């Protein structure tokens, strides 16, 4: 019976623990018939305990067995309670050990947050930090915000977001004129190059023909216009024949112009700009009020 109860308390890894049958409140007395008819010899009715050795067989042997069987559960109960208390103590010791092992693993992996108390100012406000419970406290209004990275700033500036830092030297209208001015300057450069190529030959041809004076100048201007017009037509036909190549070339040139035009001015450039503006204002004041200058 003692081994059966001990087996019920011990854990069984191979299956469920079988429910223990409740023990009877008291053992049923067994009637022992010590008559000579049922017993084969005198040894059958011998006492089972060491205390009864040497006593003669009497009629009260059944009562002694009943009292011995009743004393067995009372002896077994404190032993079972001691085993249960030892098992609970071992579980209590295992829990802090396992918790310390888990905390050591988390610290080795870098997953455990370092807890610290928030510093309390004189006004009673807490500074942002990690709360003792392990959660992040909400940053106050005076806490510094995270600065965006350089890449995010560049992307925001390229997209023209409203929160991006403004690097424009002038207003938006002045910035929009950069691309139009570039196209205009390219056309002017092309036209001036064509005029420079055909101006001298036309002038020499008119001089050989003896066409000088106002008539020669008029003919020189008209012939230069026609030569530049045909030259522009030839160049534009070449550009329209290969639009992708020239568009890439124009885009690269425009990117270089925008990078130079929209860059932030340095300290020296800003100082020179302020000095030039101050000189211009002084000159305007002197021009407006000549009497004050004297």
Curated annotation (Swiss-Prot):
Where do Basic and acidic residues bias regions lie? 52-62, 73-92, 278-294
**Domain of life according to the entry:** Eukaryota
- For the modification Phosphoserine, the affected residues are 34-35, 71, 90
Q: Where is the composition biased (Low complexity)?
A: 35-44
Decide whether keyword Phosphoprotein is in the record. yes
Annotated region Disordered: the residues are 1-148, 268-294
- UniProtKB keywords: Phosphoprotein
Q: What is this protein called?
A: Uncharacterized protein C6orf47
């Amino acid at each position: 019976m003692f081994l059966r109860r001990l087996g019920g308390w011990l854990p069984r890894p191979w299956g469920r623990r079988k429910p223990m049958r409740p023990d009877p409140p008291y053992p049923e007395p067994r009637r022992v018939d010590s008559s000579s008819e049922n017993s084969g010899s005198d040894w059958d009715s011998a006492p089972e305990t060491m205390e009864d050795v040497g006593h003669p067989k009497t009629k009260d042997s059944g009562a002694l067995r009943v009292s011995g069987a009743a004393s067995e559960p009372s002896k077994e109960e404190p032993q079972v309670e001691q085993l249960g208390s030892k098992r609970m103590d071992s579980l209590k010791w295992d829990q802090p050990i396992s918790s310390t092992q888990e905390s050591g693993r988390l610290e080795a992996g870098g997953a455990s947050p370092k807890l610290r108390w928030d510093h309390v100012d004189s006004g009673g406000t807490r500074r942002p930090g990690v709360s003792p419970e392990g959660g992040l406290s909400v940053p106050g209004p005076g806490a510094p915000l995270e600065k965006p990275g350089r890449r995010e700033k560049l992307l925001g500036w390229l997209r023209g977001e409203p929160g991006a830092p403004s690097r424009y030297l002038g207003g938006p209208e002045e910035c929009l004129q950069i691309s139009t001015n570039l196209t205009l300057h390219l056309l002017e450069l092309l036209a001036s190059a064509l005029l420079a190529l055909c101006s001298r030959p036309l002038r020499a041809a008119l001089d050989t023909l003896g066409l000088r004076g106002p008539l020669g100048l008029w003919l020189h201007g008209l012939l230069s216009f026609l030569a530049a017009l045909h030259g522009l037509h030839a160049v534009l036909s070449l550009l329209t024949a290969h639009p992708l190549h020239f568009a890439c070339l124009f885009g690269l040139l425009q990117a270089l112009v925008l990078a130079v035009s929209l860059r932030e001015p340095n300290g020296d450039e800003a100082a020179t700009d302020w000095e030039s503006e101050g000189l211009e204002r002084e000159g305007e004041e002197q021009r407006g009020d000549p009497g004050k200058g004297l």
